[in-house]
């Protein structure tokens, strides 16, 4: 596929006829064209390249720098499918196929595979955009969606690793832990995740117009700390009311770590109608691995029924990973792994183009997290106690939240 031409060296056919930058840009144009054909036809594309450009194209397909292409070993016995006046038949020829379902990360040589766990998320986003069915939704925006992706997303939490995309999720998690339901407490911290769902208009649409603005009802934190209590409003003191699931989780990890009932749920059918928004991430289970001679390791698996891949899922990953770290800190464990099982995995239609931009970005190393002081009670942890190091996010990509 030489739709952009094949520049030759003016005197030596064994040498490239363009700069490294020019070759890389040309490879990117070819790959963009392949992507366009896939989107329009959903059919395979056969690509034929020749000489030095073969290595360049492979490198760029794998999302690696052009310079890495020089390390690829290629046979010189490929079929001569191109001919021009001064062709050098000792140059390798590449005849390959790009399929619509082909993802470059699956073909990285083991020595070059970055194995960055964020690719699990990026590959899922790409699959939903390409293969998801169109579905109307309650917000009126519309989505592309698939149900129950085959593999869960798994993240290594050892050595303090935190799969984090925004530090603002720290405040939301501590808000959950506190059992509070007032979105204004987050807004005062500059966190506006819940503003839309706590607005007067939205509450009125839900039949909750009698509540003051910001009163979200018995959402996540309330269920974690007061499951079964009768909800009045966001200003009521619920101390001692209902089941404190989070306290029970921590107690079980300390006293009965092999228990198979160490669960935390936010899904309470009795309260769904009085919540501003029913919970999207509804259940998590903890597992304590106690291998002989090793410190106990804490794992968490969460099930999410409604998975907004653009805005929700990356932040939910960070939030539950951090929750695992905090529970590990107060139970004498080491955080080990977080797994996410997805139900309705969807991309809102107005997020497709922004997410395509995100797919072009190479993931960066996840930051590390630790507590600045020793804490035995999870309720004593404050935002200033949480130290996140090595956080180097890409620039923000704007995506509107559908309410």
What are these regions (language model features)?
Residues 36, 40-43, 59-112:
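Acidic, low-complexity terminal tails and accessory targeting/binding regions
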Residues 24, 28-36, 58, 324-328:
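Generic structural signal for well-ordered alpha-helical scaffold segments
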């Amino acid at each position: 596929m030489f739709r952009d031409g094949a520049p030759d060296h003016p005197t030596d056919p064994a040498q490239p006829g363009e700069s490294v930058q020019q070759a890389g840009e040309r490879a990117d144009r070819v790959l963009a064209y392949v992507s366009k054909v896939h989107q329009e036809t959903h059919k395979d594309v056969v690509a034929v390249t020749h000489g030095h450009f073969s290595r360049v194209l492979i490198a760029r397909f794998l999302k690696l720098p052009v310079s890495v292409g020089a390390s690829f070993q290629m046979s010189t016995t490929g079929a001569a499918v191109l001919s021009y006046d001064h062709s050098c038949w000792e140059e390798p020829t590449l005849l390959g196929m790009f399929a619509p379902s082909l993802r470059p990360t699956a073909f990285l040589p083991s020595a070059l595979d970055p194995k960055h766990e964020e690719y699990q998320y990026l590959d899922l986003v790409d699959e939903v955009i390409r293969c998801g069915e169109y579905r109307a939704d309650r917000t009126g925006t519309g989505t592309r969606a698939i149900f129950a992706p085959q593999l869960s997303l798994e993240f290594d939490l050892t050595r303090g690793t935190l799969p984090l995309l925004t530090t603002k999720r720290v405040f939301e998690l501590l808000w959950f832990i506190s059992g509070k339901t007032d979105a204004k407490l987050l807004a005062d911290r500059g966190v506006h995740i819940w503003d839309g769902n706590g607005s007067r208009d939205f509450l009125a649409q839900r039949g909750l117009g009698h509540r003051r603005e910001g009163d979200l009802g018995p959402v996540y934190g309330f269920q974690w700390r007061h499951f079964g209590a009768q909800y009045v409003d966001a200003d009521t003191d619920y101390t001692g009311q209902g089941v404190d699931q989070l306290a029970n989780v921590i107690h079980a990890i300390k006293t009965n770590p092999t228990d198979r009932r160490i669960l935390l749920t936010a899904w309470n059918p009795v309260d769904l109608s009085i919540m501003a928004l029913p919970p999207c991430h509804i259940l998590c289970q903890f597992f304590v691995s106690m291998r002989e001679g090793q410190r106990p390791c804490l794992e968490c698996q969460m099930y999410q029924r409604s998975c907004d891949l653009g805005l929700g899922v990356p932040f939910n990953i960070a939030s539950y990973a951090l929750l695992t770290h905090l529970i590990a800190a107060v139970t004498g464990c080491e955080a080990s792994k977080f797994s996410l099982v997805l139900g309705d995995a969807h991309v809102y239609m107005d997020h497709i183009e922004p997410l395509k931009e995100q797919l072009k970005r190479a993931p960066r190393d996840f930051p590390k997290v630790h507590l600045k002081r020793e804490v035995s009670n999870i309720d004593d942890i404050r935002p200033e106690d949480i130290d996140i190091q090595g956080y180097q996010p890409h620039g923000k990509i704007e995506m509107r939240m559908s309410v």
